[in-house]
Amino acid sequence: MSTPQSKAKPSAAEWTVQDATELYRIGSWGEPFFFVNANGHMAVRALDEAGTTMDVVDIVNELRRRGVQFPVLLRFQDVLRAQVRRVNEAFRTAIADANYGNISRGIYPIKVNQLHEVVDELLDAGRPFGMGLECGS
């Protein structure tokens, strides 16, 4: 019985951005928003015309400098808005491609995250798609 050979782990000096990207499988969960930057830090890409990026380590260091108590929650509204648009457009495309004679309305289960800022952002982003809230149990 043979076992697959695992790739030798690189030393810290040999570690690359690609190594981090593969190890943490960022391509499967983070694209197009999250990536490992040239410094080897987790970074966030805003989907604006300027191509703004934010180094998460820089954000954490700035919060520490300001005396903010940890843990903290970092919320990137561009990500929420873009994902609402992405899901709704995917359903619209599938409905059109299948010549389905009805519509789809996204419903956000409020028990997932009740924070006012999150719910407002999701509802605002979902307004063009008729998105609503599910408040049941």
Question: Which residues does each predicted region cover?
Answer:
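A charged N-terminal "starter" segment
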Residues: S2-G136
